[in-house]
Amino acid sequence: MAKEKFSRNKPHVNIGTIGHVDHGKTTLTAAISAVLSRRGLAELKDYDNIDNAPEEKERGITIATSHIEYETENRHYAHVDCPGHADYVKNMITGAAQMDGAILVVSAADGPMPQTREHILLSRQVGVPYIVVFMNKADMVDDAELLELVEMEIRELLSSYDFPGDDTPIISGSALQALEEAKAGQDGEWSKKILDLMAAVDDYIPTPARDTDKDFLMPIEDVFSISGRGTVVTGRIEKGVVKVGDTIEIVGIRDTQTTTVTGVEMFRKEMDQGEAGDNVGVLLRGTKKEDVERGMVLAKPKSITPHTDFEAEVYILNKDEGGRHTPFFNNYRPQFYVRTTDVTGAIKLAEGVEMVMPGDNVRITVSLIAPVALEEGTRFAIREGGRTVGSGVVSKIIK
């Protein structure tokens, strides 16, 4: 019945649960669904339904992920939860589930554990901008001082990875107790903690800028010459808006060029503007066909620059995923597929790392042989002879 009330007129935010194995991420996901469904704001999804996550393929990588949706008074949320630690790593690196913010679940009984740390680091590396903390299993800790200690520990850990630990909302509660209450048709103290958590998420995680409000960027897929009219480049607009008469830059592979948009077409029809998500042809003034190639991007002037060297967080496919069967070593030279093209690059491993095995998640430094339009958060595939052997995200630009 709750489904009828679902509306699309609230701002949309993507979030997910992260944290150490068995600290209660999936139970919390089920509890949020159960507590909100009593208010007609969610469809009830039970624990098993969320835990038996379907496997999906994203860029050839198998990832098990559960997606649920729910609403608060103010917003509509899409929430992802992964059953296994490896699924989180893959999810965050491939961007299969882009998160505008995350709920970090920490057991009050155990405090932060190795994967707690790893998920915070990954969030920092792949650009999850905001974290709200749910200190779970508070019903198992009688000592208020112990709860305070765990909270301090979490704040210090967040600060050590450049998140604002002192200002991060931390809500303590029990996902299991809240789930039991909701199942019994009651609204008790534990359910209130879930509502407190959602109020903190509403309040602390900002509504992301819509893609159309961001700076214009369009990866070039193809280039045509139209006699008497000039050069047309085609592609799907990644973000922003482009209008006839706009000054834009062509960035990547060669020196940056500046030109003016003299036409925007979609399905062979002339348009005044194209926006994020549109597949368009853009007519460029005074640009020769041989000056432009696939792999370059059209962008708002000064919004993105070409780079060759960067640090990245990568996941290397295992052999069951169609990846390599053998490890690779320092100076390995695969192709990096960024947006629409492959560029060869050399990989430098971190100090003390001898080799990388299929299935590993590592931080690497890359030097490309040609500059490509890059920024922190740009995602790429690592390929060898046309097959994908890894997936990564730029965590820091070097030059």
Curated annotation (Swiss-Prot):
Domain tr-type G, chain residue ranges per copy: 10-209
Enzyme class, first EC level, given as a word: hydrolase
Catalytic activity: GTP + H2O = GDP + phosphate + H(+)
Amino acids binding GTP: 19-26, 81-85, 136-139
Keywords associated with the record: Cytoplasm, Elongation factor, GTP-binding, Hydrolase, Magnesium, Metal-binding, Nucleotide-binding, Protein biosynthesis
Region feature G4, mapped onto this chain: 136-139
Single GO term (MF): GTPase activity
Start and end residues of each stretch annotated as G5: 174-176
Stretches for region G3: 81-84
EC number: 3.6.5.3
Locations listed in the record: Cytoplasm
InterPro entries found in the cross-reference section: EF-Tu_GTP-bd, EF-Tu_GTPase, EFTu-like_2, EFTU_2, G_TR_CS, P-loop_NTPase, Small_GTP-bd, T_Tr_GTP-bd_dom
Chief subcellular location: cytoplasm
Entry GO terms, CC: cytosol
A Pfam short name: GTP_EFTU_D2
Stretches the record annotates as G1: 19-26
Job description of the protein: GTP hydrolase that promotes the GTP-dependent binding of aminoacyl-tRNA to the A-site of ribosomes during protein biosynthesis.
Record's subunit section: Monomer.
Family: Belongs to the TRAFAC class translation factor GTPase superfamily. Classic translation factor GTPase family. EF-Tu/EF-1A subfamily.
UniProt protein name: Elongation factor Tu
Protein's organism: Campylobacter lari (strain RM2100 / D67 / ATCC BAA-1060)
Gene expressing this chain: tuf
